[in-house]
């Protein structure tokens, strides 16, 4: 049975589907819970722990179906939850050599990886490069905090720097998807700070294509002419 230190796990279960920011956050976590519970003895990797809000939900799902959860954080979060299925490793989640040395069973294939650690474009890109090859066919890669909208001007969490970083991560997720479109499905769950979920269709052994930015078009002669005529 999962025990949590900083919050009541049952409150997350109860809030799923409810209005408000916490309801949206709970719904996103319970979406991951549902997917884990659809598997038999899944292996789950969590990048970023903090107070264990996602850790408790993921561990509960793993306990129900005989799975295992490995959580990574540079801060000592070893006491945020207790669960027989949980392994915590205090490390940078891009130190793959150490992670695989301490949790070698991850080499068998990861069913779901939840990315919610250092929010920087370079770091998330590196996480994708390192861990995507270990995700099993039909497995999932979930990215928390991908929607820049809550940080935009006039929004509840108005913050220029966070808006810029979150938008870069949003774009990276799309760039990675379109570079590997034949091998992935992608869906978004908006609300709170947003979550993106990719499902991997390719065999575990297949390496991904490098993400490439598709340049957008912002103006054309036709749209410019319409503006000059006073039309939208």
Residue ranges and their predicted role:
Residues 1-114, 118-232:
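A short alpha-helical cap/connector motif
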């Amino acid at each position: 049975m999962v025990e949590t230190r900083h919050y009541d796990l049952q409150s997350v279960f109860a809030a799923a589907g409810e209005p408000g920011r916490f309801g949206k956050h709970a719904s996103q976590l319970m979406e991951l819970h549902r997917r884990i519970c659809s598997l038999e003895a899944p292996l789950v990797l969590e990048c970023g722990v903090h107070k264990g809000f996602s850790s408790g939900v993921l561990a509960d799902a793993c306990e129900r179906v005989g799975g295992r959860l490995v959580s990574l954080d540079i801060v000592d979060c070893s006491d945020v939850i207790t669960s027989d299925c949980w392994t915590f490793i205090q490390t940078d989640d891009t130190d793959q050599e150490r992670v695989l040395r301490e949790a070698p069973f991850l080499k068998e294939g990861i069913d779901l990886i939840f990315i919610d650690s250092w929010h920087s474009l370079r770091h998330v890109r590196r996480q994708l490069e390192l861990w995507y090859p270990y995700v099993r066919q039909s497995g999932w890669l979930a990215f928390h905090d991908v929607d820049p909208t809550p940080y935009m001007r006039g929004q509840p969490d108005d913050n220029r720097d966070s808006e810029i970083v979150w938008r870069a991560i949003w774009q990276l997720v799309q760039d990675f998807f379109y570079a590997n479109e034949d091998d992935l499905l992608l869906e978004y769950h908006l609300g709170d700070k947003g979550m993106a979920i990719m499902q991997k269709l390719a065999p575990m052994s297949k390496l991904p294509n490098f993400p490439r930015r598709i340049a957008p078009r912002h103006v054309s002669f036709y749209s410019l002419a319409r503006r000059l005529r006073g039309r939208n």
